[in-house]
């Protein structure tokens, strides 16, 4: 058999727990999976995607009280590392959905940091939202996540604002996975 040939002729040890014969789309190898379009192509395996999302979720817990700068630094480190490792694979759609989800979570964190309705209204007005809309959002009874997906927060805490460094250049902006992947 093949195992005898590998062990006797080549002098290699075969690990039976790791060795298997299967179709490429059933295989996970170093975090990568494979799928067949017209030919087999490389993608991040589903388990790798779930692990990445779980790590992002851990860094964007709203109960964790760390500064936004430190949070962005950790997120940038994680996103760059993951995208660099899986760069050879096709993952544009996955990264687009991750970026949308991450922006919503960041908006929730910022909304919670502003705490008081008065502060929220003032900060929304600073971001260019008119007074009526800002007041309506600030005094809303909706939950954090529902408010993070509204027009007021989506346009005031936009992708452009999140990725832009602050005025003192102490904080670099947030790196978005899809932009980094396509660059």
Model-derived features: where do they sit?
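Non-catalytic terminal/accessory segments
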Residues: 1-183
């Amino acid at each position: 058999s093949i195992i005898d040939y590998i062990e006797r002729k080549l002098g290699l040890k075969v690990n039976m727990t790791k060795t298997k014969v299967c179709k490429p789309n059933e295989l996970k190898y170093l975090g990568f999976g494979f799928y067949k379009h017209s030919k087999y192509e490389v993608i991040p395996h589903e388990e790798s995607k779930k692990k990445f999302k779980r790590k992002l979720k851990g860094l964007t817990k709203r109960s964790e009280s760390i500064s936004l700068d430190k949070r962005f630094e950790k997120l940038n480190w994680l996103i760059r590392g993951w995208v660099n490792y899986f760069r050879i694979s096709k993952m544009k759609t996955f990264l687009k959905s991750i970026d949308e989800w991450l922006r919503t979570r960041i908006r929730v964190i910022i909304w919670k940091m502003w705490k008081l309705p008065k502060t929220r209204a003032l900060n929304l007005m600073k971001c260019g939202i008119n007074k009526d809309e800002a007041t309506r959002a600030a005094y809303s009874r909706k939950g954090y996540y529902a408010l993070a997906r509204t027009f007021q927060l989506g346009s005031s805490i936009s992708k452009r604002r999140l990725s832009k460094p602050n005025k003192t250049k102490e904080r670099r902006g947030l790196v978005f996975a899809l932009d980094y992947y396509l660059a």
